[in-house]
Regions:
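Short, hydrophobic/amphipathic alpha-helical packing segments
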Residues: 64-65, 81-84, 176, 284, ...
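A conserved hydrophobic secondary-structure block that centers on an alpha-helix together
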Residues: 77-78, 152-155, 165-219
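Extracellular structured ligand-interaction cores
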Residues: 82-86, 94-96, 104, 127, ...
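Aromatic- and carboxylate-enriched substrate-binding clefts and catalytic-loop regions
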Residues: 188-498, 534
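Glycine-rich, histidine-containing beta strand-loop boundary motifs that form or position
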Residues: 31, 41, 91, 100-103, ...
Length: 671
């Protein structure tokens, strides 16, 4: 059951697709708490959700702010990351319910932080819709929520192959060399992602003709090898009288404005930039169709970045800071009381300043709306602009699209990656724990920067992260300029194991793709915590580092440096697969309970649940070469029992998802 409660004058976020009447009266489970709400938690209660947020799967014990932020330090003390995903699921004894706070500005959550037995939340202004979902278990409530917010984005099938990316591929030859090296080292590859270096002066929808003289030919040459080019698009439009996107946006009045009606300006990668007012339908249509400059070159996929929006500085704030520094110029000794707040704090405060976010406006139905009041909609609205345009630019075809910033609702138009993480073992664990949370909120096509984006990775971290990343829908190796090059062929000491693991990803695609399509078409889960399927098992409720994957698998990644095994909890008997390659593994049936399982660096652990089948193909160099007509069936069946598996296989490129012939039933009988 879904109930909607409305307060004040909610902003139309368009997060939901169902129109429900507002109810009055008390809200079940909640009591008023000043301007917000609270509920008492028992000692055993668990709270799930909030999507892209720090900390574990169970969010209890910390406080959070839904406030899309360009946060480069992904540490446990942070309160916000790139997405605002205001869905919570509470399990307390036999009580289970979900809450969705539909509000475009800041939402503050205290989940057992100030008081361990109390959950409270409030919005920045008193205008919001609150949805209560009840009457089922965790999986049923998540399914109901996904019905409320609409079908998740479905990418092309080739987007489930490996993507190699780096901020630092500066020329066409750099890109071609990556493709050559992957082929030379016999490593499968489906995508090469291009960062801002392909652009002319970092301006959207342009190509630097000196560095990339013929993007159309480059795209065609790579596509002939089964590899797609995936370029980046940033939110800021370069201030340049010779740039058509800039001049058209100015002429049409399509950029966000300050209070005096002049366009808001802030600096990002191209220097001074304007920002499209994505909350206006006509602006979304205009900006989205700008992608045509690249789809005409044969490009079939994009990633949107810097769209919180990230602001390096505004000219006004930079000028004030420099004037303040000039006042300190003649001082021989700057006391720490001045140095830290004025110099360090002043410099750090230039970027993503709350004052800047409060200084420009959107136009909504002819009315001015201050940006900070609807801030969390911006990145998702950019995704929507592109997603809607692709239906015109590439009719009937799927286009790959994923974004850094997001809001519930934008999951219908694209996926997400989990932002600028770092190369650390802690970030590998964070990746594991964040996946079920973002997928609860509809972002099925999601993944982290494998190996880590910032700082230098190591061969063992690269391999262990791959052993989990090969299970995530978006499987992308991405890193920052100035860090160690981390293409998978650069680790000779672990290269055979890396090759086996990438090939294992491709072999598992009949299962992984089927489970993704079930989740998208039937509003079920791809990743989920053990607690969702075993709610009455107190040990399962406390597992934070194992995930159920679709119907039949459980993953237990190794995420500790130098570890050669790990503890695993099995809520029921399962078949262990200790995999070194798709055709090289040990299997063992283990009873329910706690186990310590050895796992060498070149091995990964998967567990087959009883009564289930996992179809496995022969590995391929890319998804277009994958032959899933001849399959091996992994299974865990008691003697004399049989099982079925619904496998999904379509053309992988058109939007005709729902044809019955896409489904094939596989059967096995264990005699």
């Amino acid at each position: 059951m879904i109930q909607r409660f409305s307060f004040g004058h909610p902003f139309p976020t368009q997060s939901v697709v169902l129109s429900l009447p507002a109810e009055s009266g008390p809200i079940p489970f909640l009591t008023p708490d000043g301007s917000g709400w609270q509920l008492t938690l028992s000692e055993q209660a668990a709270v799930y959700g909030l999507g892209e947020m720090p900390r574990g799967i169970n969010k209890r014990g910390w406080h959070y702010i839904a406030n899309n932020t360009d946060e480069s330090r992904h540490s446990e003390d942070k309160l916000s990351f790139y997405g605002a995903h205001n869905f919570l699921l509470v399990r307390d004894g036999s009580t289970c319910f979900g809450l969705f706070v539909d509000f475009p500005g800041k939402v503050y959550y205290d989940i057992g932080y100030s008081r361990h037995d109390l959950l409270s939340f409030h919005t920045e202004t008193p205008d919001y819709d609150l949805y209560l979902l009840s009457g089922g278990n965790e999986n049923a409530i998540c399914r109901e929520f996904r019905t409320l917010i609409g079908r998740s984005y479905i990418p092309p099938r080739w987007a489930f192959g490996l993507a190699q990316s780096r901020w630092g591929y500066k020329t066409e030859e750099d890109v071609r060399e990556v493709a050559r090296q992957y082929k030379e080292h016999d490593l499968p590859l489906d995508m090469i992602c291009m960062d801002i270096e392909y652009m002319q002066d970092y301006a959207d929808f342009t190509v630097n003709k000196e560095r990339f003289p013929d993007l159309t030919k480059l795209s065609a040459d790579l596509k002939a090898q089964g590899i797609r080019l995936v370029p980046i698009i940033d939110a800021g439009v370069r201030v340049d009288p010779n740039d058509s996107t800039c001049t058209e946006g100015l002429e049409k009045g399509y950029f966000c404005k300050k209070a005096d009606g002049t366009p808001f300006v802030a600096a990002v990668w191209p220097g001074k930039a304007y920002f499209a007012d994505f909350l206006r339908p006509e602006v979304r249509e205009w900006f989205g169709h700008k992608y045509k400059a690249l789809t005409d070159c044969g490009i079939e996929g994009f990633w949107n970045d810097m769209n919180e929006p990230s602001l390096f500085y505004s000219p006004e704030r930079l000028r004030a800071f420099l004037n303040d520094m000039a006042a300190l110029r003649e001082k021989d000794n700057i006391e720490q009381e001045e140095f830290f707040p004025r110099v360090v704090g002043g410099a750090m405060g230039l970027m993503n300043s709350p004052a800047d976010y409060a200084s420009f406006y959107h136009e909504v139905d002819g009315q001015k709306v201050r940006h900070d009041q609807v801030h969390n909609l911006y990145g998702g609205s950019m995704t929507r602009a592109a997603g809607e345009a692709f239906t015109d630019l590439r009719p009937g075809q799927r286009t790959l699209l994923y974004s850094r910033s997001s809001f519930i609702g934008s999951h219908r138009y694209g996926g997400i990656w989990l932002g600028d993480n770092n190369s650390s073992w802690a970030q590998l664990l964070a990746n594991i724990q964040m996946m079920p949370s973002v997928q609860m909120c509809g972002f099925l096509y999601s993944g982290a920067d494998l190996c880590g984006f910032s700082s230098d990775t190591t061969p063992d971290l690269a391999l262990r992260w791959l052993e989990f990343g090969l299970l995530t829908p978006l499987m992308r190796n991405h890193s920052a300029v100035g860090t160690r090059m981390q293409e998978y062929y650069r680790f000779p000491e672990v290269l055979p194991a890396v090759r086996n693991m990438i090939r294992l990803r491709y072999a598992l695609l009949p299962y992984l793709y089927s489970e993704f399509m079930k989740a998208a078409l039937e509003n079920t889960s791809y990743f989920r915590p053990l607690a969702f399927d075993y709610p009455d098992d107190p040990d399962a409720r406390e597992v934070e580092d194992q995930l159920l994957l679709g119907e039949g698998l459980m993953a237990a990644p190794v995420y500790v440096q130098n570890a050669h095994g790990r503890h695993v909890y099995l809520p029921e008997p399962m078949k262990l697969l200790r995999l070194r390659a798709v055709d090289d593994y040990d299997e063992e049936i283990l009873p329910a309970g706690h186990h310590y399982i050895r796992c060498a660096l070149d091995e990964m652990l998967l567990f087959l649940r009883p009564g289930h089948i996992v179809p496995v193909a022969q590995p391929a160099n890319n998804t277009s070469e994958l032959d899933d007509a001849s399959l091996t069936l992994w299974s865990f069946l008691p003697d004399g029992e049989s099982a079925e598996y619904r496998m999904y296989r379509d053309d992988g490129v058109t939007t005709e998802y729902e044809k019955k012939e896409h489904w094939k039933t596989l059967q096995i009988h264990h005699s």
